[in-house]
UniProtKB/Swiss-Prot annotation:
Keyword Lyase: no
Membrane-topology annotation of the record: Multi-pass membrane protein
Chain location of the short sequence motif TonB box per the record: 31-38
Disulfide links within the chain: none
Gene designation per UniProt: btuB
Protein name: Vitamin B12 transporter BtuB
Amino-acid positions noted as binding cyanocob(III)alamin in the UniProt annotation, renumbered to this chain: 90, 97, 115-116, 317, 528, 562
Signal peptide boundaries: 1-21
Biological role: Involved in the active translocation of vitamin B12 (cyanocobalamin) across the outer membrane to the periplasmic space. It derives its energy for transport by interacting with the trans-periplasmic membrane protein TonB.
One GO CC annotation: cell outer membrane
HAMAP family reported for this sequence: BtuB
Sorted UniProt keywords: Calcium, Cell outer membrane, Ion transport, Membrane, Metal-binding, Porin, Signal, TonB box, Transmembrane, Transmembrane beta strand, Transport
Segments traversing the membrane: 163-170, 174-183, 189-200, 223-233, 238-254, 271-285, 287-304, 317-333, 336-345, 363-379, 381-391, 395-410, 413-427, 445-454, 460-469, 484-501, 505-520, 528-540, 546-561, 569-583, 596-607, 613-625
Native source species: Yersinia pestis
């Protein structure tokens, strides 16, 4: 776990420039390589910020049906979802807003339509995910806007040649069918194809209706999703390789909605989200230098409509977003460290059509950023730093920086301290929407301090961290002036302990968290964040049976009852949740899996007024050849 003097130097010299954008290599001593923390490859143990890696093997072992189910197991993560599969969700990292999390897909910023500026991970197909790298703490000095609470990098595709076919059934009419293959075309070309279809009848999420939002809807709120992925990679020579990828998904979700003011017969209770992504890149490596260039385009359409009248009716609404990205990154190996320098450019175009289709808003924003990151080891001390400047078409130049230091004061034990600044730029809808847009908005800004100690005590690898995050100029909607303004401040304090150890065939992972997220002006607790969390993951294998037990305790939380005016604060009680999963290899090719989610059928809410599904059963089978 802790960094050794030989680990960083040896690992980087061996693996640093072998497909460094993917971050899925391991060193000779089985220390995983990651790239997300500082935009260069490094052993996971050398990263000074808290970092977690989830592999495809982990996802299969846990039998997660969506990305939210994967992330909820990780330290610092709190998820609030409006019901079951496909319903809107919010992701909070260390108590920061859901819009303060930077989500990357294959290292490229996720394009998210809508006015919130927050990434809704409930809509990303789990079958698309090969690996997740998760960094806690500010990273705007590395990536720019949004990275106040942390960064999640979702890596797609398939990691080795072969073909996998799988199918699954579960509660509430759940069914999924999945296939992927990777084949070599000659010695230098690799083709990867994947597809998925998922369907669930769902259940009635209720959504606190009837109330101010709309009528009671005693129906199932289901979900259907389709996904296709294709990739091509070619090794031109020892120095150059290139790749091209295209993938897309179409999702449809039912929810408890609202009546349209212009047509009382139009009940807006269906969401259709369509996303298409095209990217290509070229990598070069030669000795101590490596470089990568990526170009990417994404288009997302987000409809909300009444099935009675259709998505193109005048009662429907549409958020459409286009995103262009260019990235150029360069990595240099030093004697006992690495540095990375580069630039990225992004253009976003957003179009929103109102519910009467007569009001159309079309906005464009572009951003150019330059960055420099580095890590250097000097004896028992590891130093890390980053600086970045962004030129935004709306608010001009904005600079951020961060620095960290780690001291291995005793063999196997390390003290770590860090400080970082971060920001969140206002999105186009907040700036220019006809419904309260404010072109004078300033970026939200944060300052975060963190101190910690980590060590290897017998079989136990552990880390204790304490942090404080002060966030200024928070953007919120004012009902008094009917517009968006920089009106709030937040102070978030937290303590986090993580540990992992093995006892014979049993593998244990434990997280203990205490969080105090408050509005700095009113001292109110920020909504939908648990003050205490306990997470425990137990995995073991006995007689070819691969078992997994997951426990999560969510402490007291608060929310708002938006069906009242003015909205009232309500308390959501704590809850303990258990999951049980088991898999069995019938043959060397066929594996069957079963899972019980919410084993003891606990009744609880993540969002006030929205029911959770209760106990659920899942059964899947996969065939590899």
């Amino acid at each position: 776990m802790t960094i050794k003097k030989y680990t960083l130097l040896t690992a980087l010299s061996v693996t640093a420039f072998s497909g460094w954008a993917q971050g899925n290599n391991t060193t000779d001593n089985n220390d995983e390589m990651v790239v997300t923390a500082n935009r260069f490859p490094q052993p996971k143990s050398s990263v000074l910020a808290p970092v977690d890696v989830v592999t495809r093997a982990d996802i299969d072992r846990w039998q997660s049906t969506n990305i939210n189910d994967v992330l909820r197991r990780l330290p610092g993560v709190d998820i609030a979802q409006d019901g079951g599969m496909g319903q809107r969700s919010s992701l909070f990292i260390r108590g920061t807003n859901s819009s303060h999390v930077l989500v990357l897909i294959d290292g490229v910023r996720l394009n998210q339509a809508g006015i919130t500026g927050a990434s809704d991970l409930s809509q990303i197909p789990i079958s698309l995910v090969q690996r997740i790298e998760y960094i806690r703490g500010p990273r705007s000095a590395v990536y720019g806007s949004d990275a106040i609470g942390g960064v999640i990098n979702i890596l797609t595709g398939r990691d080795k040649p072969g073909t996998t076919l799988s199918a699954g059934l579960g509660s509430n009419g759940y069914q999924t069918y999945d296939g992927s293959t990777q084949q070599k075309l000659g010695e230098d070309t690799t083709v990867t194809l994947a597809g998925n279809y998922t369907y669930s009848k769902g259940y009635d999420v209720v959504a606190g209706m009837p109330g101010a939002g709309g009528p009671r809807q005693p129906d199932r709120d289901g979900f259907m999703g389709k996904m296709l992925w294709a990739g091509l990679e070619h090794q031109f020579n020892e120095q150059f390789n290139g790749f091209a990828r295209v993938y897309g998904f179409d999702n449809r979700s039912d929810y408890d909605g609202y009546t349209n003011y212009s047509n009382p017969l139009a009940l807006i209770d269906t969401r259709k989200l369509s996303s298409r992504t095209y990217d290509t890149g070229l990598r070069y490596k030669n000795g101590i230098y490596a470089s990568q260039f990526i170009a990417s385009y994404n288009r997302t359409k987000d409809y909300n409509y009444s099935p009675l009248f259709g998505q193109h009716d005048i009662t429907a609404s549409l958020d459409e977003a286009e995103q262009y990205n260019l990235q150029w990154g360069n990595t240099f190996q030093l004697t006992n460290g690495m540095i990375s320098a580069g630039a990225d450019w992004q253009e976003q175009r957003t179009e929103r059509k109102s519910s009467n289709q007569n009001t159309t808003a079309d906005f464009t924003q572009h951003n150019t950023g330059i960055y420099l990151t580095g890590q250097q080891q000097i004896s028992d001390v590891t130093l890390e730093g980053a600086v970045r400047s962004d030129d935004n078409s709306q608010f001009g130049w904005h600079s951020t920086w961060q620095t960290s230091a780690g001291w291995e004061f005793i063999d196997g034990y390390r003290l770590i301290g860090s400080y970082g600044t971060a920001y969140k730029a206002p999105n186009l809808m907040q700036l220019y929407s006809a419904y309260g847009g404010n072109a004078n908005l300033k970026p939200e800004e944060s300052k975060q301090w963190e101190g910690g100690v980590e060590g290897l005590t017998g079989p136990l690898t552990w880390r204790l961290s304490a942090y404080r995050n002060d966030i200024d100029q928070l953007i919120d909607y004012s009902n008094l002036t009917n517009g968006y303004f920089n009106i709030n401040k937040a102070t978030i304090k937290g303590v986090e302990w993580t540990g992992s150890f093995d006892t014979g065939p049993l593998s244990h992972q434990v997280t203990l968290e205490y969080l105090d997220p408050r509005n700095a002006d009113t001292h109110e607790i920020l909504v939908r964040r648990a003050k205490q969390q306990v997470k425990y993951q137990l995995d073991w294998q006995v007689a070819d049976l691969d078992w997994s037990v997951t426990y999560q305790y969510l402490g007291q939380r608060y929310d708002k009852d938006y069906s009242t005016y003015p909205e009232e604060t309500v308390e959501l009680g704590g809850v303990s949740l258990w999951d049980l999963a088991v898999s069995y290899p019938v043959t060397s090719h066929l594996t069957v899996r079963g899972r019980i989610a919410n084993l003891f059928d606990k009744d609880y809410e993540m969002v006030y007024g929205y029911q959770t599904p209760g106990r659920e059963y899942y059964f899947t089978g996969s065939y590899n050849f």
